[in-house]
Amino acid sequence: QERVADLLNTVGLNPRVGRRYSYEFSGGQRQRISIARALAVEPDFIVADEPISALDVNIQAQIINLMLDLQEKYGLTYLFIAHDLAVVRHISDRVVVLYLGKVMEIAPADQLFDRPLHPYTRYLLSAVPIPDAVVERERGYLKLDGEPPSSIEPPSGCRFRTRCPLAKEICASVPPPLVEHAPGHVAACHFAGQLQ
């Protein structure tokens, strides 16, 4: 019971809540309990799959800050799986972009967000709202054409080719390898960095 109390305290919950039933907790409290459960085995590595997706914005910020504090305190490494790119940018050191189960790009977070090389990454980032209304109005959006292909029967070659404006014949026949374009920055595209 002492260990449970310590873990609950570590994630910002009063140890007395340990006697409650699960339905008595809010979403944020449940997430804190999930984090405490993960910490119970004293891990070095935690997989966090959409850890804040079902929470309101204030609680999201609290959970992200808790995760960052715990990372610093315990030297944790996270595999943070998320679709909220603003949060990904805030919490990540390195980012991997996937499309239909294949790696499109891997880079240090700052490089990926400032200088994306893969067309899919460029499209993803162009969809992220910018809080500055003037900048938001003036920036150009990249619009994807076509329908996403089937993940059960993905296209040959590059999986993004059916929606990519740079696609050529080679993209259908030769899956692009991950190629390093800058230190630690790799992209799987025959025409990486060419989308304007």
Regions found by a protein language model. Give the residues of each.
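Conserved ABC ATPase signature
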Residues: 21-25, 29
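Charged, flexible cofactor/metal-binding loops and thiol motifs
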Residues: 108-196
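Conserved ABC ATPase "signature" region
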Residues: 1-16, 122-126
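P-loop NTP-binding/switch modules centered on Walker-like glycine-rich loops
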Residues: 47-51, 55-137
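Interfacial catalytic loop of ABC nucleotide-binding domains
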Residues: 2, 19-21, 139
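Conserved catalytic motifs of ABC-family nucleotide-binding domains
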Residues: 42
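Conserved ABC ATPase nucleotide-binding domain "signature" region
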Residues: 29-32, 36, 61, 149, ...
